[in-house]
Regions:
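Active-site-adjacent segment of FAD-dependent monooxygenases/related oxidoreductases
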Residues: 13-15, 163, 172-176, 187-188
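Short aromatic-enriched loop/helix-cap "lid" or pocket-rim segments at secondary-structure transitions
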Residues: 24-26, 53, 162-164, 174-175
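A generic helix-loop boundary/linker signal
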Residues: 13, 53-57, 121, 141, ...
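Conserved FAD-binding catalytic core of PHBH/FMO-like flavoproteins
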Residues: 1-75, 79-84
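C-terminal lid/capping helical subdomain adjacent to the catalytic/cofactor pocket in oxidative enzymes
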Residues: 114-115, 132-143, 152-157, 174-222
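Conserved mid-domain beta->alpha element of the FAD-binding
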Residues: 62, 86-172
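Residue-level signal for alpha-helical context at structural boundaries
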Residues: 58, 81, 85, 169, ...
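Short, P/G- and charge-enriched loop/turn segments at secondary-structure junctions
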Residues: 7-11, 94-95, 194
């Protein structure tokens, strides 16, 4: 059945200490009884290294070994994990930004151009923006070569900034900051640990880098 509001995105835990859970609904009433299809992601550090394979099936028991005790009166992550149709496992890695995407009539787009930690939805979102920019320049430019150069000029620098930002100050920074300051002590008011002004500053800084802030979006529509 739906949890919290039925449209809640739930993050629990810190990557650098406990591991992290992320749960969110992606489809309502999948069975006629009001149940939702839930997507979940867990992250934890591991000494095991395997070559990157984005379609490798994982073992849910390996995941549960880290999160079996994570049960709450409003939410039961282990039960949701056990009911998964399948589990995929892959390394959370990026690559250093490169200086050039376009080579004659060939250019790069998406993860081929700027593989990044998928924070803030940017793993897929920036690929969509790449495609939109490339399409726009192919329609407007005098030649395909000119279009590819213009596309690279528009998209290379912004995506480079996001790749680097996701390494040092991703949206997870809010959780990590609160966890560090709370020092394993319970609190009733978030404002006692971090101010609203700090929360807004972290959020707005990331929005500006990603190009989601109000000023950037308004400029694109003018």
């Amino acid at each position: 059945m739906p949890f919290l509001t039925g449209a809640s995105i739930t993050r629990i835990g810190g990557l650098f200490t406990t591991g992290k859970l992320l749960f969110y609904p992606i489809r309502n009433n999948i069975d006629g009884d009001g149940n939702q299809l839930i997507n979940w992601v867990v992250e934890f550090f591991s000494d095991k290294y395997e070559p990157a394979d984005w379609s490798r099936l994982g073992d849910v028991n390996e995941v549960l070994a880290h999160f079996e005790s994570w049960r709450f009166d409003w939410f039961d992550p282990p039960t949701i994990m056990r009911n998964a149709d399948f589990v995929l496992t892959y390394p959370m890695v990026d690559r250093d930004p490169i200086a050039q995407w376009t080579f004659d009539r060939v250019t790069l787009l998406g993860d081929a151009a700027h593989p990044m930690y998928p924070r803030g939805g940017n793993g897929g979102a920036q690929s969509i923006l790449d495609a939109a920019a490339l399409t726009r320049h192919l329609v407007k430019a005098a030649s395909p070569l000119e279009a590819l150069r213009a596309y690279e000029a528009e998209r290379l620098a912004p995506t480079r900034a996001i790749v680097l930002q996701n390494r040092t100050a991703p949206p997870d920074l809010i959780i990590d900051t609160v966890e560090q300051r709370a020092n394993k002590q319970k609190f009733d008011r978030l404002e006692d640990v971090i101010s609203r002004e700090e929360l807004m500053a972290i959020s707005q800084n990331y929005q500006q880098v990603a190009g989601w802030d109000r000023a950037s979006l308004k400029a694109k529509t003018v």
